[in-house]
Swiss-Prot record:
The gene is ihfB. InterPro entries: Hist_DNA-bd, Histone-like_DNA-bd_CS, IHF-like_DNA-bd_dom_sf, IHF_beta. One of its GO terms (cellular component) is chromosome. The keyword Transcription applies. This is Integration host factor subunit beta. It comes from Aeromonas hydrophila subsp. hydrophila (strain ATCC 7966 / DSM 30187 / BCRC 13018 / CCUG 14551 / JCM 1027 / KCTC 2358 / NCIMB 9240 / NCTC 8049). It comes from the Bacteria.
Amino acid sequence: MTKSDLIEQLAASRMHMPAKDVEAAIKEILEQMASTLQNGDRIEIRGFGSFSLHYRAPRVGRNPKTGDKVELTGKYVPHFKPGKELRERVNIAE
């Protein structure tokens, strides 16, 4: 599901809310989440999961085109850990 699909489905299920308002709300939620992670804070949505930053240590990588070794710097990457309710719900669907 893409962001556009999400907006479309939410707008269809919320007849009283125009698609433009749904789109603005989704964009604001995602912006706030990105901003929170950018500040180094953790996001927890009970029953769904949590978003945090994990540190990737510096390492030696490889350029796939040339095969040359490349030094990669350490960096923080977003990480999602699903909550118990989401994990159980997904496993029931199988």
